[in-house]
Amino acid sequence: MRNIASFFSSVFNPLLLPTYGVFLVLWVSILCYLPVGSRLTVLLVIFGITCILPMVLIALLHNMRIITDKQLRTRQERWIPYIFATLCYVGAAFYLIHVHSPLWLTAFMWGAIASIVVACVVNFFWKISAHATGIAGLVALLFSLHNMGLAAFDIMWLICLTIVLAGAVGSSRIALGHHTLGQVLAGYVNGVVCIYLAELLFS
């Protein structure tokens, strides 16, 4: 059981979720008709900015003994990586603007930035689940694509699958003892509200 929980926690690491989100947009929305090479280039750049760079920083902080745990399970050690991740996400948003991405794609990144800022602020007095925030953001993104008529095909099955995965990820965090039910639920709310509002405001 613990191995399954660890699997879900690793596969849906918060640093991977922006890449998953951009992948979904590029492959299930009307943008799927763009050349594959162009889509892969955007995806790889987003992966580098929002995943590789923060991972390198976390490794450096760990080697410098500024943080004691690469998994950032200690609340007090999360704020520096959160701030750096926010800067990386801002860079990713401006990259999407630079390549003339639709406003509703850039909105996803601004929503992700907002969710990190909320998590960072809350982190000073309570621990909120970043995993739950990220996976709930994907659910909100898919709902937005569906409601705005931007999906290239019927994605209700994908929305349902993502909701199930969100439940699995949240349950995994609780099973591993990293979060309470309240912290996971707060993460869900954070992800859904930030991404959905960003899509409404910027689209």
Language-model segments: what does each one mean?
Residues V99, W104-S203:
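Membrane-embedded catalytic cores of phosphoryl/pyrophosphoryl-handling enzymes
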Residues F84-A93, G134-V139:
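Core segments of transmembrane alpha-helices
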Residues S29-S38, I67-K70, H98-P102, G149-A151, ...:
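Membrane-interface helix termini and inter-helical loops of multi-pass transporters
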Residues A59-L72:
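Cytosolic, membrane-interface loops and tails of multi-pass inner-membrane proteins
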Residues V36-I52, R75-Q76, Y188:
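Loop-to-helix transition at the N-terminal end of transmembrane alpha-helices
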Residues S9-S29:
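The first (N-terminal) embedded transmembrane alpha-helix
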Residues M1-S6:
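Short, Lys/Arg-rich, polar N-terminal cytosolic tail immediately upstream
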Residues F8, D69-F84:
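Juxtamembrane helix-capping/reentrant segments at transmembrane boundaries
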